[in-house]
């Protein structure tokens, strides 16, 4: 994936086509700088918060944000690692994600800070859905368990395990899980266990599997990309947005 700074000129050109131009947003959470990406086609657009995978915020998330803006949604792609931190080595990716897995309160604070930043840019965070990929999917479920007042939580090939001592008793919005049944990183046993937890907690949820799809099946150009599963899951996600948000 290319770095976020590499694609801003291209993004400004593509944004003109649908009347919205995205921009980098530098913001602070607890004294540390973060760099997200915000795009909105109108002042009253429903809002979507996007959480990146373990590569950090790159052109992949920006492309997804622009795709949603074309459909009429305001999108803030947040940053969980820090301004300029876009790991490319496996050990660095594990380090940055591991730090947040070990410090769930920090993870929650960063997501809250991102929502506050989006609100300051004009986003309607009371009419909002959050979604994420891989590590970002795990963060989405962390936000759901925190009791965040959002209308929906969606994950693509995201982490599904619930940390010890946590549950979904405070979850407010509906949960949508999209998972590859050939994913060896996040197993079907974990998928099944999450289904049991959500059912027990009485959380409205929908969980979909895609046959033959491996982990990261939505990543364009990746060696595990599966076009059919990507298109089907994206279609279902956009339907979920239309069903969940006030347009």
Regions found by a protein language model. Give the residues of each.
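A conserved short beta-strand
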Residues: 149-159
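Alpha/beta-hydrolase fold nucleophile elbow
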Residues: 122-133
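C-terminal catalytic histidine-bearing segment of alpha/beta-hydrolase fold enzymes
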Residues: 199-247
